[in-house]
């Protein structure tokens, strides 16, 4: 995230940041650390940004040089429509679109060139199924022109120098060799399944998880445009979301996550990206029902599991 700011903007440049969660908020914080003037579109947590709001902001101030957004906002479980945003930003030759696809790439289709996504970043630790430690970035010709003029200092995250080295089959600094070897296997697995089938599977798993939780009497936090990378579930009244995710781990060996900031105790989050299958979803829904029952919440055991099974059996 830092490199996608320091390599393309200079102190005093203007950026438009979509703040609809913890990681959207982070865009603004990093921009300010590099002396970039930030305009934020604050989106209620659980909502996706309205593309019209972005279009209106750029129309009001065409001097904005970059728009920063998450394709998948991990803190809320919302997916922003980066395809629509790309169409908008294409109309501004002096503005680039930068997309955080850390929990999106490998989950659903992202057409960087066709959609006009100038800079797209991701990491090894999400749908690419590897340990953390390696980041990836794609850069359009339009964005490279910005990099030639940027005046923010960057030593380790210098994309221009990295590009020069990679043209010689080298890296700027010591590479994460073990992760690169692991990435070979990841790509082999993805290629064997086929991207279209992989995206369809991820979508089916996400749909089954959401509908299974609803059938168990729980509400899904995103109001619209839920991400297929994870499901963010609202805790029932009187039940602490932190207790739910902790009991999932302690009692049933399922690693989930709690809410962040104002969502702490109010939601819990379950991932189904990467190497996940139908029975991972069924197990997660079943364990959630059992945890809720154990915490004294009224839930009909098997109600959510049955719904998830119906969806997962569909062709």
State the predicted function of each range.
Residues 1-16, 20-28:
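Conserved beta-loop-alpha segment that forms the PLP phosphate-binding cup at the N-terminus of a helix
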Residues 49-102, 106:
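Active-site phosphate-binding strand-loop segment of PLP-dependent enzymes
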Residues 193-201, 215-224, 259-261, 295-306:
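Flexible, glycine/charged-enriched surface loops at secondary-structure junctions
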Residues 219-251:
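Conserved PLP-binding catalytic core of the aspartate aminotransferase-like
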Residues 262, 266-315:
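PLP-dependent enzyme catalytic core of the Aspartate aminotransferase-like
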Residues 113-125:
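Conserved active-site segment immediately N-terminal to the catalytic lysine
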Residues 125-211, 215, 315:
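Active-site C-terminal subdomain of aminotransferase-like
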